[in-house]
Amino acid sequence: MIIVTGGAGFIGSNIVKALNNIGYKDILVVDNLKDGTKFVNLVDLDIADYMDKEDFVASIVAGDDMGDIDAIFHEGACSSTTEWDGKYMMDNNYQYSKDILHFCLDRGIPFLYASSAATYGGRTDNFIEDRQYEQPLNVYGYSKFLFDQYVREILPQADSQICGFRYFNVYGPREGHKGSMASVAFHLNNQINAGENPKLFSGSENFKRDFIYVGDVADVNLWFWQNGVSGIFNCGTGRAESFQAVADAVVDFHQSGPVEYIEFPEKLKGRYQAYTQADLTNLRAAGYDKPFKTVAEGVKEYLTWLNRSV
């Protein structure tokens, strides 16, 4: 059995899909379906069982026998960069991760988990998996950063796989439940379908991010599991592309426009990553050599999926 926490969420459900694609269906999805809309991410997937997150935490803390587990993909977290309840964030993203990590270490179970490029904070270069380059801007980034530090202390003595992925700007199918935290491509597509012009913040040609397609993220997770590699790795394309490029790809798909520009929100100033670009040196050195989709390629595939029944 494989366990995927956050398995009804965005990246988690795409990992479940990737596992299904290689014939793996003995999957336990762990999630919190208080937001019932997330069920749609699972309806076309094959899983063996579902477990509520609170029940799962209680079970692993109690040390319950959950049978043979081939791996745990830990994608469950609060991923809102605008959430400022630090206790909630640390319980969800830090303590929960530690509980699962020790459950895996005690049983020799491969543990692959979601970290984040938010650990790098507001820097504009050297997005390298090293402490000197890490300075998160918000409590979400701090929760991910602190768990990475915790893992770094344990890695040298660990007898089983521990692998963290610093996700950059992930976009693609199954993110609709994320609301305001969904990708720019998702929101621009909705605006056009509602008969509006797509909207970007003023200066979006200067805001550049490393946008990575969620199918590529799932491929990275499966490859590292299948190859037993441990460490903390950036998971991006190694390219910085502008929000304008995303808008151009959406407009090109719909053959509509023009793009409207709106004022940059005051509340985001100083807490917004204006530039990200993954350094893939360590990822490539580990042996992962597959190419990553460009924004133009990924957005086209995503919008084809999003608009399949429109």
Swiss-Prot record:
- A GO molecular-function descriptor: NADP binding
- Alphabetical GO biological process terms: ADP-L-glycero-beta-D-manno-heptose biosynthetic process; carbohydrate metabolic process
Instruction: State the protein's purpose.
Output: Catalyzes the interconversion between ADP-D-glycero-beta-D-manno-heptose and ADP-L-glycero-beta-D-manno-heptose via an epimerization at carbon 6 of the heptose.
Which SUPFAM superfamilies is this protein grouped with?
A: NAD(P)-binding Rossmann-fold domains (SSF51735)
Reaction(s) catalyzed by this protein? Answer: ADP-D-glycero-beta-D-manno-heptose = ADP-L-glycero-beta-D-manno-heptose
Names of required cofactors = NADP(+)
Q: In its UniProt entry, what is this protein called? A: ADP-L-glycero-D-manno-heptose-6-epimerase
Q: Has keyword Isomerase?
A: yes
Keywords (alphabetical) are:
Carbohydrate metabolism, Isomerase, NADP
The protein's superkingdom reads: Bacteria
Which Pfam families does the UniProt record give?
Epimerase
Does the record bear Isomerase in its keywords? yes
| Textual note on the cofactor | Binds 1 NADP(+) per subunit.
Positions of NADP(+) binding: 10-11, 31-32, 38, 53, 75-79, 92, 144, 170, 178
- The encoding gene is hldD
UniProt xrefs under InterPro entries: Epimerase_deHydtase, Heptose_epim, NAD(P)-bd_dom_sf
Which NCBIfam families does this UniProt record tie to the protein?
heptose_epim (TIGR02197), PRK11150.1 (NF008360)
- Protein family (similarity comment): Belongs to the NAD(P)-dependent epimerase/dehydratase family. HldD subfamily.
Identify the HAMAP family for this entry.
Answer: Heptose_epimerase
User: Annotated pathway, please?
Assistant: Nucleotide-sugar biosynthesis; ADP-L-glycero-beta-D-manno-heptose biosynthesis; ADP-L-glycero-beta-D-manno-heptose from D-glycero-beta-D-manno-heptose 7-phosphate: step 4/4
Q: How does it assemble?
A: Homopentamer.
Comment field on protein domains: Contains a large N-terminal NADP-binding domain, and a smaller C-terminal substrate-binding domain.
